[in-house]
Each structure stands twice: as C-alpha cells, then as structure tokens.
A protein has these predicted regions:
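Structural signature of tandem alpha-helical TPR/SEL1-like repeats
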Residues: 66-75, 103-115, 139-148, 175-183, ...
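Hydrophobic face of amphipathic alpha-helices that form TPR/SEL1-like repeat modules
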Residues: 57-64, 75-80, 89-98, 125-134, ...
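Short helix-capping/linker turns of helical repeat alpha-solenoids
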Residues: 52, 65-69, 82-85, 98-100, ...
Length: 239
C-alpha cells in the first residue's frame, strides 16, 4: 500500500450538514407511516380491495385468475366491472362464458363482452367476432361477426384479420372476394399469424397478375389504416 504523497494538498473533510440528516429521517418516518396505514387498512378490510388503486386491483385479479383462485378473481373483476372498468368487464365475461367461479351464463357473458367492446377492448371485439362467426354461444350471425372482427383487426389484432380473410375467401355472409381475402390474410401474416399464410396462399391461386397487384395494394392500404387507428391512441384494453 503506497503512502500519500506529502506534497499533495489534503482535501479537508466535508462539514457535517444536519439538514441532510433531518431530511433523511423524515423520509424514513413517512415511509413507515405509509406502511402502517396500508397494513391497517388491510387488517380492517381483509375481504375488500377498495383501498387499492385500480391498476393494482386488476393486477391482483389477473394473478388470482392465472393461479386458479377464481373466487378472488371474480370478486375483484365484479367490483371493477360494476364501476364500468372495461378490462374487468372483459375478464368477467370470459369467466362467465366458461363458468369459472360463477355459473356459466352465455347471455350474460355476451352482454359483458359487448360492454367491453364498446370501449374498444380488442380481446372482447375478437371474442364476439368468433362467437358470431362460429356460433359458439348463439346461432351464427356473419354480419355481426364481420363488424366485430373489423373493429379488432383495425386495432391490429392478427387473428381477427385472419378470420376476416377466411370470411372473404369462403363468402360467409357476403360474396367471395379473393382480393379482400388475400389482403386481410397478408395483413394477418405480416402481424405475426402463422396460420394466415395458408389463407393468403389459398387466395393467391385465384388471382391473376393484375389482381395480385391490386390485392397487394389493398393490403398496404389496410396496414396504413391500422397505423392511423393505433398511433397515438391509448391502449384499447385500458379504455
């Protein structure tokens, strides 16, 4: 270990400033009081979550759902859904559709999905599109299916875009349109849908060279509209 060079001036020690110590102690006291308050609220209301922020409500409910604690999940989602929280309405619809923690009730599930979809929750729009397309809970309604799938697709959902491509290819509720079928399938493929590539290739075989160029241009037009819909917009699931 080298000794300091005696020729170098030594820096005098920093003077002690009691103000910093007081501020530090103050922060510690505030943190302790906050922790005591939260613990007190939790003890006083062990079955209530109203003292928590909404974002934390949702996080707790979603964790409970994924861990299989359906009773807790339903309780919190129901509280938030009653306050018109669209994300909670979607989750409660999902659980009601499947009968998780609540009696299975297709009509109530659809009503909740529609409330969430009205607030642009993309997952709710997609599920309603699937329900009306496949007749999962109600008789098929291709007009409703197309409307909800378009809403979800224009918010960038690849599965919704793929299903729209199928509808146009098969002519479900409309005349078959290979250009629209290719365009929507291409959009879904570019957005990450693996299955959409098969739909796109199936539509491609029905198009001559000129129509193929038209279909590619239509896909670009759709992508541009999706960009306009999603850029600068708040996350649909939180509206």
């Amino acid at each position: 270990m080298t000794s300091p060079d005696p020729r170098e001036p030594r820096r005098p020690p920093e003077p002690f400033n009691p103000l910093f110590a007081i501020i530090g102690i103050g922060f510690v006291i505030v943190a302790l009081l906050a922790a005591i308050l939260v613990a007190s609220l939790r003890d006083q209301h062990p079955n209530q979550t109203s003292w928590l922020p909404k974002a934390e409500h949702l996080e707790i409910a979603e964790k409970a759902f994924r861990s299989g604690d359906n009773e807790v999940a339903v309780k919190i989602f129901s509280e938030l859904a009653a306050k018109n929280n669209a994300t909670a309405q979607y989750w409660l619809a999902h659980m009601t559709e499947l009968g998780l923690g609540v009696p299975r009730d297709p009509a109530k599930a659809i009503a909740l999905y529609k409330k969430a979809a009205a607030r642009n929750v993309v997952a709710a729009e997609l599920r309603l599109g699937e329900i009306y397309l496949h007749g999962d809970l109600v008789p098929p309604d291709f007009g409703q299916a197309k409307a909800y799938l378009e809403e979800a697709a224009y918010y960038g959902d690849p599965r919704a875009a793929m299903l729209l491509g199928q509808m146009y290819r098969l002519g479900l509720g409309m005349s078959a349109d290979p250009i629209e079928a290719y365009a929507w399938s291409e959009v879904a493929s570019l957005e990450g849908s693996i299955f959409a590539k098969r739909e796109r290739d199936a539509s491609l075989g029905k198009l001559d060279t000129d129509k193929q160029q038209e279909a590619v241009a239509r896909a670009a037009q759709i992508l541009e509209q999706i960009k306009r819909e999603t850029t600068g917009a708040s996350a649909p699931s939180s509206k």
